């Protein structure tokens, strides 16, 4: 019997009894209240439901929103949280601001949107099906739900398809432990799969000596394809086929010829692209991470050194929006094996038979101290190498000066370089500021091999705003549209006089940027060239109160600090007349100019070029083994952090020179690195302000006019081999392989 019939039978007797007891009169009483007469008042009088208090959330990855115009802000709701984001933000970005981490494989914040992995599906109110949050723009009032059963089921289904052809070989995969596919399959995937057919396999591709490929693991996210074309500026990778036959590779078998190719290892979310030199060496949880900086060029890219015990195992990039973003060059990433080859571990003295023998520090310093007093003060020369830190250069300068000589300089600072005004050797626009330029004039520099991360900024700007690029110098290969204007000073003269066709574009540019290579400092007519460059800058509104587009791209990590500290060659003939030469890591000095009867002390960490001319060898620590201050090409001061212990009996550079000063009878007045930095503060205060950029205060208007004439000699290539530029890279087996395989490629 139904519940409805049972209820009606139960109610009927009671209703009949009620009818029998009532009279025939019907009374109706109406009670009127003010709330009933006004619906608005009634709504106000009703108690409001209690407001749900949501727990606070923090933006994902420290995401921050900046509104250039408050009217461009729109409000969306993410899981009930009201969030204001700028117009043009995607749903995924809005979720990150709201503190929700959306899973993704194909999306990368620095690459274009592909929307092909579908892992970022979320539910949007009034949408018939889940939407890809990476490609969907956020709209005003949009209500986004990220944790509903529909969104969870959609992601679970996507993950099942992604794992359908994946080999699931995590135990032998180098990506294990830092794999996005591992993490997201655990968090968003199912605990079982329904695929029982045979899995496909893909032939591995040969991309060169740096990147290892296991293409069967590839999930076709196309991050590497987009990175190659959008950031590296090369069209080496592409996608072939469709459906289950889809794969990533090169249409014609070739190597990846970019100087940034190693970055595809970091952005690959699976183990399809891994480091070939690091293969099967270590797991990430076995490594100790140390945040430091790179010294292979003058950019000062932020890096993380992963070590195990006394050995550096790998180098990976560290985020710094102002310098290298999250990319590093292949030279920075893979030169680490040079830190354990050809190292100098003990003090040595050349014997009478021409061979070196190991001695104690006391004996080595005693020999040097005796010899230095046997020569005249003006015959003493000190040269700092391109990898020297500010502390060691300051101590070397003080020591040589106390010995009565002014002949102390750093590699790359030739005689006659004007270091009185910092604007004349710094990148005044700043590296990140290059993105605001709409025209580039490159003079005697090839950023692709001299400073790969500066070149990446230029490439990014050209792609984003179609900025024009003009180049004056020897023929070179660029990875963006560039017009070759000429090869030398004659072209500069035409531009300065307004006779060159490029002058029209230069005149019409709103924010023109001129980048001058530091290789011009070694020319005899450098002052005339720089004067011509400054006249071009003044005539074309390159330098003004709101924009300084006059830039100098330095070549070495030690160059900027050396110029700040005054390590400048006084005479071009100083080396040829020297009787005592102190080379502190200076391997690119022309040792043929050193007299045969001169006594040479080599202080450094590698047995490189100059060590064969040395009479005494003093072992020093490398940049991964010491704390030192460096200033990059834009004037940004940073410090290295020791990641591994020193090799053998090596010591820090400044400590060696400080001990030598005491043995030589000219004891320097500091015993700690803090004391050295106090001395630096009195000479160049900007070098003690770590992680800050000190811009140049003055411009070309204060510089006197140069009367010299420019030579007609064309500009020369500064970097002949991108992979072999200092003692560490020259000792690297990986860099030697790259040089052998890629030497015939255009960019080297």
UniProtKB/Swiss-Prot annotation:
Subcellular location: Mitochondrion inner membrane
Enzyme type, top EC level: translocase
Residue stretches of biased makeup (Pro residues): 47-58
Cofactor(s) the record lists: [2Fe-2S] cluster; [4Fe-4S] cluster
4Fe-4S Mo/W bis-MGD-type domain residues: 287-343
Extent of the transit peptide: 1-33
Main location: mitochondrion
SUPFAM superfamilies per the UniProt record, alphabetical: 2Fe-2S ferredoxin-like, 4Fe-4S ferredoxins, Formate dehydrogenase/DMSO reductase, domains 1-3
Signal peptide positions on this chain: none
Family: Belongs to the complex I 75 kDa subunit family.
Record's function text: Core subunit of the mitochondrial membrane respiratory chain NADH dehydrogenase (Complex I) that is believed to belong to the minimal assembly required for catalysis. Complex I functions in the transfer of electrons from NADH to the respiratory chain. The immediate electron acceptor for the enzyme is believed to be ubiquinone. This is the largest subunit of complex I and it is a component of the iron-sulfur (IP) fragment of the enzyme. It may form part of the active site crevice where NADH is oxidized.
Name of the protein: NADH dehydrogenase [ubiquinone] iron-sulfur protein 1, mitochondrial
Organism of this sequence: Arabidopsis thaliana (Mouse-ear cress)
Source lineage: Eukaryota, Viridiplantae, Streptophyta, Embryophyta, Tracheophyta
Gene: EMB1467
